[in-house]
Amino acid sequence: MNFQNIFIFVALILAVFAGQSQAGWLKKIGKKIERVGQHTRDATIQGLGIAQQAANVAATARG
């Protein structure tokens, strides 16, 4: 009976440490995905600005 309690305690400690290491791995992937999203957002904003400038030039050229 005492061995069972010790086994459960050790298994619980291992589960806690394994959960923390998994969180670190998932956190790294999440940060990479977030960075890709930020770059996509910035590129879209920059592209819209260039498109607006081109539209203004075209409108000015037409008169």
From Swiss-Prot:
Q: Which InterPro entries match?
A: Cecropin, Cecropin_insect
Coiled-coil segments: none
Note one Pfam family from the annotation. Answer: Cecropin
List where in the cell it is found: Secreted
PROSITE patterns in the record: CECROPIN
- In terms of superkingdom, the source organism counts as Eukaryota
Q: What is its main location?
A: secreted
Q: Name one GO biological process term.
A: innate immune response
Q: Which residues form the signal peptide?
A: 1-23
Mark the residues carrying the PTM Arginine amide: R62
Gene Ontology CC: extracellular space
Q: Report keywords, A-Z.
A: Amidation, Antibiotic, Antimicrobial, Immunity, Innate immunity, Secreted, Signal
PANTHER family (UniProt xref) = CECROPIN-A1-RELATED
Similarity section: Belongs to the cecropin family.
Q: What does this protein do?
A: Sarcotoxins, which are potent bactericidal proteins, are produced in response to injury. They are cytotoxic to both Gram-positive and Gram-negative bacteria.
Kindly provide the name given to this protein in its UniProt entry.
Sarcotoxin-1A
